[in-house]
Amino acid sequence: MASMLVQHSVKDFAAWKKMYDSVADLRASSGELSDQIYRDASDPNKLTAIFKWDSLANAQKYAKSPELKAAMEKAGVEGPPNIHFLNEV
C-alpha cells in the first residue's frame, strides 16, 4: 500500500479544515483510502497529513493535480508543501 506524507503551514486552521473537508470526495475518487491529520504541538498551524492510497501512481498524480494546487491556495496553505511518497513494508 502506498502512503503520502504532506507537511505545510496554514494561515488559519479552521479555514483550512473547511476547505480540506470540502474536497474529500475528490481525494476519494482519486484513490485515497484514508487520511490522518496532525497539528504540531508547538504551532497549531503547522500540519502533517498521512494519506493511504490505492496505488503510488494515483498518489503521485493527485499530488501534481491542478485541483489540489487550487484547493491548497484557497485554503491558505503557506509556501510549497513538503510531500513524501512512501511504500509500506
Label the predicted regions.
Residues M1-E67, K74-V89:
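Short S/T/G/P-rich N-terminal loop/turn motif that feeds into the first structured element of a domain
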